[in-house]
Every structure is written in structure tokens, then in C-alpha cells.
Amino acid sequence: MAGFVLPHDHGEGGHIEDLHRELMNAAHFAAASEIFKQLSDPTRVRIFWLLSHREECVINLAALLEMSSPAVSHHLRSLTESGLLVSRRDGKEVYYKAADTAQIRMLHEIVEQVMEIACPERAVDSQASQEAIIRHVHDELTADL
């Protein structure tokens, strides 16, 4: 049996069978899709970016974003449920920050690359490092597929 064959051969070669097999397993793409869905909202991107730099409580986030606390809480709940953020309670206050995982750190770097802004703690400087970050993010996001 010849395996998967495309209707038009453009001479690109490659491992089309492997690519096709991955494409047909749509469940593999669900986690990445959910993360990108969360980051499709500009307010959530702003919150994620800020909380990648520091832990904050809802009241301070609302002040920084010039939004109501309930509106901020709505976004925080969604980002936390998706695994992008983590929270901790200290008395009556709940503090939020970006989850401390390699994937979340890479998403933070991607957000900064797309926005062309530098993280206050460091600056990403070269095209080569940008490409390395993108490759690393791809590898991390598809590692468990």
C-alpha cells in the first residue's frame, strides 16, 4: 500500500503520511486551540502579559486596567480555568499570576514578540532567538500530541 497521496504533487516531498495522521487527530489540537481562544481577547492578553511579570490582586488589576473588579474577575476566572494563570488566597485577597510552566513562559515571550515590546526584565534581541523561541514553543505545544 502506497500510503497517503495528495491529488497534486508539487514536488515538496516530506512526510505527508505523518502530517496527515496528525491532522486527522483533531483532539491533539484542542488544547492549543483553547489557549489561543483565551488569548483572542485583548483584555485577556493585557491581563496575561501583566501577570507574567508580577502577581496581583483583583483590586489592583482593576485599577491598572481601569476596569471594574467584576469584569476583571470574569477574565481571571476564564484564564485560570484554561491553565494560563494560577491563584492563591491570602486572607480575603486572591492573588493571580501566570502559571510557572515552560509553555506559559513561551506564550509570554510570543505575546511580547507579536506586540514588539520588551519584557521589563529582559529584551529579546535577534531574529535567530525569535525563531528559536517559536520552534521551542511549537515543540512544547506538540510534545504530548
Predicted feature descriptions by range:
Residues 80-90, 97:
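Beta-hairpin "wing" of winged helix-turn-helix
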Residues 63, 74, 80-81:
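Alpha-helical residues within the helix-turn-helix
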Residues 1-28, 102-145:
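C-terminal regulatory/oligomerization modules of transcriptional regulators
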Residues 71-72, 127:
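Intrinsic low-complexity/disordered segments
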Residues 26-70, 94-102:
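N-terminal helix-turn-helix DNA-binding core of bacterial DNA-binding proteins
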Residues 72-76, 92:
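Generic detector of contiguous secondary-structure segments
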